[in-house]
Amino acid sequence: MRLLETIGYNDKIKVIALIGAGGKTTTMYRIASCLNKIGKKVICTTTTHILKPKEKYPFPVLGTPMKDNPEKLSAVSVEDYQRICKEYDVVLVEADGAKGMYIKLPASHEPVIPKNA
């Protein structure tokens, strides 16, 4: 679980937000897989938009289906976010959209990092 060491993970960490351009979703799923392997109850979500996973993971990926783009998920409600923070050991949040670009300049409303991250 070298990845967990690299990011400085410890048992006190409850919410991890991923920001920046390129690689957030892949990194989120890799971290979730590592946490799952050490017995943590983990869930992935977003405060922006993510593509629906194409493969099945051993952990849930939660988002609100987008009406205008069925391939994507958007943020869950505040109530659902608060619920999953109570129900899961670790919540991983993709908190910054980059639309697949490897470099970006954030807008004034970005990133959307949860207060408890």
Question: Where do the model's predicted regions map?
Answer:
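Generic detector of short, locally flexible boundary/turn motifs and exposed helical patches
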Residues: I7-N10, P58-P60, I84-V90
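Walker A (P-loop) phosphate-binding motif
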Residues: R2-I38
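Phosphate-binding/switch loop-helix module in NTP-utilizing enzymes
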Residues: N69-E110
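A short, flexible low-complexity segment enriched in Lys/Arg and Gly/Pro that occurs
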Residues: M1-L4, S74-V76
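Short coil/turn segments at beta-strand junctions that form active-site/ligand-binding loops
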Residues: K14, G39-K41, E87-D89
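General beta-strand structural signal in soluble alpha/beta enzymes
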Residues: L18-I19, V42-T47, L62-T64, V91-G97, ...
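Gly/Ser/Thr-rich active-site loops/lids in small-molecule metabolic enzymes
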Residues: V112-A117
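N-terminal phosphate/diphosphate-binding loop that engages ATP/GTP or pyrophosphate donors
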Residues: A32-E71
